[in-house]
Amino acid sequence: LIGAIMEGPRLGKYIKDKAGKVKKVNAIPGHSITLGALGCFILWFGWYGFNGAAAWSGSSLASIFLTTTIAPAVATCTTLIYTWVKNGKPDVSMCLNASLAGLVGITAGCDALDAFGSIIVGVVSGILVVAVVEILDLKLHIDDPVGAVGVHLANGVWGTLAVGLLANPQAPAGLEGLLYTGGAKLLGVQSLGIAAILVWTAALMTIVFLIIDKTIGLRVSAEEEIRGLDSTEHGLPSAYADFAPA
């Protein structure tokens, strides 16, 4: 988010009137939904190793794999239905982001939530990722090309809060969430952790991006952006290296 704000939107993303007010928001699609889907499923597969590292026994590993499967699956289906109803057709690109949003959302509580909690996480993640992308794009006019803020920031916060709300004492971690015990202690701890991470990350990334901007530069030139970084950075005739002449 800090980087997107400091770097500014891509050329042609926002069309402004003479008064400088945004009058049109242009969609700049990616190169290939097919390759995007492949990358999404590679990440999903790898997430079992990522979350599975929290296990300390076979039974806890099974529980973690269950929650890690349910949340992204439910998030994907939720976004499919939500965008279908809202726009008249499902948004495949947004559904791929929803899969990742569900994975991000369940990471904090992969060993603390049960199947029911995973479903709740997935439903909220599927709606949240769409809402955040649209707010950034249409309301705040912050250009986030891959929807990283909606996937990682928003759902990282949601997933961390979900532990305080939905943690089941019978799950492997044995934590007590507000829904099951009525106690708000865990929710308070999670909220404090979120606040600390947000402040630290915002401050550190602002400094890092300022240093980059004042030294090697944070953004490529307009000419390089128009030609495309596949050409200017990598010397490729297009984004698809397989189609380049030998």
What kind of region is each of these model predictions?
Residues 1-246:
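Glycine- and aromatic-enriched membrane alpha-helices
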